[in-house]
Amino acid sequence: MIEQQAGSRIRVEALAIDGQEHAAQWAQRLGLPLHDADADFALQLTDDGLQLQQLGDDVPGAVRVDFVEGAVAHRRLFGGGTGQMIAKAVGIQPGIRPSVLDATAGLGKDAFVLASLGCEMSLIERQPIIAALLEDGLARGRGDRDIGPIIARMRLLTGNSIEIIRSWVEEPPQVIYLDPMFPHREKTALVKKEMRLFRPLVGDDMDAPALLAAALALATHRVVVKRPRKAPCIDGPKPGYALDGKSSRYDIYPRKALKPKAVEPAPDL
């Protein structure tokens, strides 16, 4: 059940004609009401999928996860491929596609980029509403002919990233990618819409140092932390180096070099 806090009360509602049953299922699963006249947000079932809408005057538009169309699809087609800074940050090179754990998945945009470039992705999202949006977007994407194979390389885990990482029992990821929530001051449209919408729900990631420490203990090859370009490093060990972009940078904490996988010889016939 989601703990309803002041300024972040949420109700579930169906906007699609036949969505009432589905809305009731989400409400039960998340422990949210279907009716709350004083709600600050509405998790809405629409014909185009699940979306989150802030209620009231002068609020940003609804946010949903869509890997098939829109900005994410455009980035997949025209974003620069392996030349993108995020690809360089996680260590993508010819013959190298590391396994990556995105421990701050959010809406899954960065994870989708890496999956589209061939990385096997695990995603962790701890905020249940954001995780629901992401789960819905992944489910819709699986049925698309073009991006279905990409979505197949993405699996979603819901819960506290630090706890999940500390109790990890599977083969460790080669790379752990972190993009902690940071107090943004930019006035871009993206910040106004998504950051304005999510900040009352998630706040800032005050446990980022503990998350970094857990990531460094699990990742076999490197940890990558995305930060606003002028933001300080996360408290803790200093990164080995950084890749700087126009508005953001990637702090790299290398452990050992990534190498191409050896190709096993074909069996004799």
From Swiss-Prot:
Catalytic activity as recorded in UniProt: guanosine(1516) in 16S rRNA + S-adenosyl-L-methionine = N(2)-methylguanosine(1516) in 16S rRNA + S-adenosyl-L-homocysteine + H(+)
EC number: 2.1.1.242
Keywords assigned by UniProt, alphabetized: Cytoplasm, Methyltransferase, rRNA processing, S-adenosyl-L-methionine, Transferase
UniProt-annotated location(s): Cytoplasm
Any single GO CC term annotated in Swiss-Prot or TrEMBL for this entry: cytoplasm
Record-annotated disulphide pairs: none
InterPro entries for this protein: 16SrRNA_methylTrfase_J (IPR007536), SAM-dependent_MTases_sf (IPR029063)
Gene Ontology molecular-function annotations: rRNA (guanine-N2-)-methyltransferase activity
Residues reported to bind S-adenosyl-L-methionine: 125-126, 179
Function comment: Specifically methylates the guanosine in position 1516 of 16S rRNA.
Family the entry assigns: Belongs to the methyltransferase superfamily. RsmJ family.
Protein name: Ribosomal RNA small subunit methyltransferase J
Lineage: Bacteria, Pseudomonadati, Pseudomonadota, Gammaproteobacteria, Pseudomonadales
